[in-house]
C-alpha cells in the first residue's frame, strides 16, 4: 500500500493527544513537523504491521527516507512520557471510561525458554 499522507483518523488522534498534552504542560506541545512525523509513523505501523524504518520508506515510495525517519526519532525532543499519559487520557475520554481498575494477569503465559543463563528465570511465583 502507498502512503501519501497520514490517515485522517490518525491525524485527528495525534491532534487530540497534542491538545491533551498542552493542557497539562502548556509549553510542551508538539510542533507541526513532529505531529506530521508521528501521524505518518502510526499510519505506517498500521499499514505495514511492523515498526521498521525501511518498510515505512518503501510504503511511502521514498517520500520519507530511512535516515530522516530515524533521525527524527533519535534527535527530536519528543516528550514521550507526556504523550503516553495524554494518549491514554484521550482513549479513556473517547470511550467514556471514567472509573475502573487495571488488572494485569500474565499467569497463563509461561516464560520463554530461550534464555538459558539467567538464574531463576523459569521459577513461577503464584
PLM features: what roles do these ranges have?
Residues 1-84:
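Gly/serine-rich nucleotide phosphate-binding loop at the start of the catalytic core
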Residues 40-42, 70-126:
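Active-site-proximal, Lys/Arg-enriched surface segment
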